[in-house]
């Protein structure tokens, strides 16, 4: 049974990855326009310094990216109040996930190491799943009110 389920998952992986890539890029573009965001780091965006390299190396751009909120308080408020975005879970699921890397995945890094790799306490890592983008946008906006 497990092998059968894995086979089914693999057979639709390309379609799911393309859908996730498209949604992630749209969400990142929307985030770039928001006044509560300082910077969005997504390799599919024209603003990314290594966009050409990413397009050359990857057939599908992953749905995981980072955004720096204008303040730590705003980033934390979003994480605490979001209803749709799941927190502290592994990325790559069908559901959208978020984390503050300086507190979770990179918590063992020093402030200097975090700064060197472009992560601040207001950086939020997003993994966009298959939810409706309108719902995700509304969830974020409602969470930071």
Enumerate the language-model features and the residues they cover.
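Gly/Ser/Thr-rich helix-start
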Residues: 10, 93, 130
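A common structural junction motif
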Residues: 82-92, 143-145
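Conserved hydrophobic/aromatic beta-strand scaffold that supports enzyme active sites
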Residues: 5, 64-66, 97, 125-127
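A generic structural signal for well-ordered coil/turn residues at beta-strand boundaries
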Residues: 61-63, 92-94, 120-122
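Structural motif of enzymes handling amino- and sulfur-group chemistry
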Residues: 1-65, 71, 75, 81
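Mobile, glycine-enriched helix-loop/loop "lid" segments at the mouths of ligand-binding/catalytic clefts
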Residues: 88-102
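PLP-dependent enzyme catalytic core of the Aspartate aminotransferase-like
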Residues: 73, 80, 98-145
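Short amphipathic alpha-helical segments with coiled-coil-like heptad repeat character
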Residues: 26-32, 86-87, 134-135
